[in-house]
């Protein structure tokens, strides 16, 4: 509180001390909160949001902490016991700031999931098991669709543009599988500037009607 000149300590480890074995000073590899990433206020400034992981970095929690008392709640978590989880997975809020698109590799492939801020999974947006998503290109809430790129054809270097409904239905590839694509979508989503190329073909810009 700037006016009052007071501070509040946020307990990112939920009461667990940083030195988990006091006699030796050894850190536990398993307790979440050793590393903290992407600290930012929620849209309504009611919570301080963050990603936090354990020292092994095979557990991730997206948490919201109250500024009044520093207590944290887990909104969602990811765990890969024998591997590693991305510390700061891409996410994108929808316009209501109560729903967000979360990127996860929980099934072994990078996919998109729609959550709300209570941590409820509304729906998987993609469920690919033979190729993975690159990232979200645009969310058109008026049309109820998400545009995203993926490595979905014979060569993983050929990035393609897809469209899927916010209900997770109607996934379709929009671009030519012969090329890799760098796309820009117009504000009204009616047109796409598509720069196509291969390792043998130089870049060519095209204007497409969605």
Functional labels for PLM-detected ranges:
Residues 1-208:
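Beta-propeller folds
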